[in-house]
Regions:
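DPxDG-like acidic metal-binding loop motif
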Residues: 75-123
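N-terminal subdomain of lithium-sensitive/metallo-dependent phosphomonoesterases centered on the IMPase/IPPase/PAP
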Residues: 1-87
Length: 123
């Protein structure tokens, strides 16, 4: 496993997702609510799709806040796992205060070994 390659892939995915988030940020976007009453926007969904597509070829499974739910029983023996929060701070995004990030982490044997935090508003 080439960690430098995976790091660059994660950085590029987060930047691309961040650009899409910022495209939506300047529009009159609609805010939906998830089952737990937390907000969900088109920016969450598009960012998630961009990141999932970018990481797909790594063949490492992923767990995303905006993706399907995977039980711990199903994933506890996975050697590697991506954890994605495609728009961390959706409430702040909705408030348009700039305090939100794109987060991607790589987990190996239940321990984080790499992470990317990208702040779209400040690049």
């Amino acid at each position: 496993m080439n960690l430098n390659y995976l790091l660059l892939l994660s950085i590029n995915a987060s930047i691309k997702a961040g650009k899409e988030i910022m495209n939506i940020y300047s529009t009159d976007f609609i805010v939906d609510n998830k089952k737990n009453d937390s907000p969900l926007t088109l920016a969450d969904k598009k960012s998630n799709s961009i990141i999932e597509l970018a990481l797909k070829n790594t063949r490492i499974p992923y767990l995303s806040e905006e993706g399907k739910s995977i039980t711990y029983e199903e994933r506890k023996y996975w050697e590697y796992l991506w954890i994605i929060d495609p728009l961390d701070g959706t409430k702040e995004f909705v408030k348009r205060n700039g305090e939100f990030t794109v987060n991607i982490a790589l987990i190996k044997n239940n321990k984080p070994i790499m992470g990317v935090i990208y702040v779209p508003c400040t690049n």
